[in-house]
Amino acid sequence: MRVHVVSDVHGRADALAAAADGADALICLGDLLLFVDYADPGAGIFPDLFGEAAARELIGLRTAMRFDEARAFSRQLWAGLDGDPGQRIEAAAARQYAELFAAMPEPSYLTYGNVDLPRMWDAHLRPGHQVLDGQRIELDGWTFGFVGGGLRSPYRTPHELDEEDYAAKVAAIGPVDVLCAHIPPDLPELLFDTVAERMEVGSRALLDAIRVTQPRYALFGHVHQPLVSRVQIGRTECVNVGHFRATGQPFVLRW
């Protein structure tokens, strides 16, 4: 069995269409939408609405950890925009999702990232797409558990959860061969982004589950340029499957 795994697609419908070439199935660990790209400030929903210069300003404030100023800057921009902000975001997100799900291979097993809008997915799913969150499946004798979303952060992205709610989804899965999540377990070396020069938020519940149940693999994304992309915890190989928007390449899992 050969499965390809991607995360942090962030609008790369072109590469997504070929992501499962040579594989029996695709697993997608979320973050399909592109709101703003730190490496390409002209791309994404935010610059589409407010322009590249505004995106650069927002990125600069966030990178400097000036989150209150970044939020105030965003509020000022939204206040000057015609129409309802929520409707403008959803319209832009719907356009991205339509393109992404049209390119998504079948069969695909998906969970949500922290920048995704789960309520919008159903309208775009194809027959071969299965969304899993706090759920498990079996593929050719191996069990896969899926945990979607992120944890609360200063960035206030759309799909962030409280620790308790996230931990409940991890607990609902139980022991599996492969633990699939958008965010990493709470290990500093997996959470530090070397380009953004900041720590992202990881899950203690995932780390505890790995230590106790010892899956063969723990797969995740979220940190685009991690200090370390793989660590071993007992028998479990923990792997950041990569920033798909940047690389266009899936992680390959065989058994």
Model segments located where?
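Active-site-proximal beta-strand elements of phosphoester/diester hydrolases
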Residues: 1-10, 141-153, 177-182, 237-242
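Core catalytic region of metal-dependent phosphoesterases/phosphodiesterases
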Residues: 6, 11-139, 241
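Active-site environment of divalent metal-dependent phosphoester hydrolases
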Residues: 10-15, 33-36, 111-121, 152-155, ...
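Short hydrophobic patches on amphipathic alpha-helices
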Residues: 20, 101, 170-171, 210
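Proline-aspartate-enriched helix->loop->beta-strand connector
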Residues: 25, 176, 203-210, 214-223
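Binuclear metal-dependent phosphoesterase catalytic core
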Residues: 136-140, 157-158, 207-212, 226-255
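Binuclear metal-dependent hydrolase catalytic cores centered on His/Asp/Glu-rich metal-binding motifs
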Residues: 140-178, 196-205
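Short acidic, glycine-rich surface-loop motifs adjacent to enzyme active sites
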Residues: 173-190
